[in-house]
Amino acid sequence: MHRYKKEASNLIKLATPVLIASVAQTGMGFVDTIMAGGVSAIDMAAVSIAASIWLPSILFGVGLLMALVPVVAQLNGAGRQHKIPFEVHQGLILALLVSVPIIAVLFQTQFIIRFMDVEEAMATKTVGYMHAVIFAVPAYLLFQALRSFTDGMSLTKPAMVIGFIGLLLNIPLNWIFVYGKFGAPELGGVGCGVATAIVYWIMLLLLLFYIVTSKRLAHVKVFETFHKPQPKELIRLFRLGFPVAAALFFEVTLFAVVALLVAPLGSTVVAAHQVALNFSSLVFMFPMSIGAAVSIRVGHKLGEQDTKGAAIAANVGLMTGLATACITALLTVLFREQIALLYTENQVVVALAMQLLLFAAIYQCMDAVQVVAAGSLRGYKDMTAIFHRTFISYWVLGLPTGYILGMTNWLTEQPLGAKGFWLGFIIGLSAAALMLGQRLYWLQKQSDDVQLHLAAK
């Protein structure tokens, strides 16, 4: 019992800064929306559309670089800190290489917008925002590579502090470039992209400064010697991170596809769906931060050759995540009207949003289990299992079921509309929770040699 209590304490210490850093990240998007909305509805819509293209693209790169966290955590746990600089340098090189195709995709935004049938003024602003935010791509991914290093060393506070500095800088920079202050051009929504690019370069430099000057990282000597690109290691990191990157990409695009499918149901339904989805994404930060912390703890314990400790870390993470989700789900049910009223005063939208928030409460519990189980499996470097199971859950089970229930009368007398899609979310996430949980259980039942061999790849 003592080990469980100690592990819970370690987990919370790691997860709390990750949670706060996520809040800061979300806050930057919120500031962009508010500032652009202060110019016009077109500017706000343009920023929103641009974000729907930017986010899946950049998260693919982030997913690739998340592979570095368990690699560093295991080397640190094993006492082989001398090998960490090589891995970090390969991660930084991978970040630069991945930036190229992501920039190429984002640079073609005008062709993507053409398929979306967006009005000309909005399309022009969307493309302008994207061409500005393109400059943030290498900084964002290099920052993620360095953050994977510090997180892997169980130092999650630096990214938290720098994330909040980024948020504080984002506000005045948005004000300057959106509204044209201090001699800067008045760029409207495009100015949000300029501010974002500047902020991420500053955040990268701040994290680099911390790593170079930190006494807690001095023994690693991460930049004492430059390690040249090693194709074999770059391919290994890419193969390790690709399943996570693909899983993240498919998860984000799933919600984007559902938003498009819900659109023909009318503005009231779309608004209610967005209320429930936006609130759920905010609550998701809790289990997501626990999943990130579990990945670090499991990787560290496996580096120490402590498979029992890794299992305890995973199990404590699952219990903590589920307990947190049960609390947030209960609060969602009890205060669903007040939550809906935070977003809108339209009573028709509020009434439907209240119904969808009941589905969101169930969704939160399933989501917590699957994201923490996935975090545990990342610690074991069992990345491919995550991809296969989440792809089947979301795209083979969740989305088709949601479409059948929401848009057809094949299983019900009348199409259920948005409720059908939320039932699809619940079915998909429940399947993911069961399959990822089963995989984790199976892995923990294997011999120490099998577990350590998998973690060593």
UniProtKB/Swiss-Prot annotation:
Q: Which cysteines are joined by disulfide bonds?
A: none
Q: Which InterPro entries does the record associate with it?
A: MATE_fam, MATE_MdtK, MdtK-like
Membrane topology annotation: Multi-pass membrane protein
GO MF entries: antiporter activity; xenobiotic transmembrane transporter activity
Answer whether the UniProt record assigns the keyword Transmembrane helix to this protein.
Answer: yes
**GO biological process annotation, one example:** sodium ion transport
Q: Where are the transmembrane segments?
A: 30-50, 53-73, 93-113, 126-146, 159-179, 192-212, 242-262, 276-296, 315-335, 348-368, 391-411, 416-436
Q: Does the keyword Transcription regulation apply?
A: no
Effect of mutating residue 100 to I? In strain: NCTC 4716
**Location in or out of the cell:** Cell inner membrane
An example of a Gene Ontology cellular component annotation for this protein is: plasma membrane
Q: Which keywords appear in this protein's UniProt record, sorted alphabetically?
A: Antibiotic resistance, Antiport, Cell inner membrane, Cell membrane, Ion transport, Membrane, Sodium, Sodium transport, Transmembrane, Transmembrane helix, Transport
Q: What is the role of this chain?
A: Multidrug efflux pump that functions as a Na(+)/drug antiporter. Confers resistance to norfloxacin, ciprofloxacin, ofloxacin, daunomycin, doxorubicin, streptomycin, kanamycin, ethidium bromide and acriflavine.
Please give the family membership noted in the entry.
Answer: Belongs to the multi antimicrobial extrusion (MATE) (TC 2.A.66.1) family.
Q: What is this protein called?
A: Multidrug resistance protein NorM
Q: Which organism encodes this protein?
A: Vibrio cholerae serotype O1 (strain ATCC 39315 / El Tor Inaba N16961)
**What's the name of its gene?**
norM
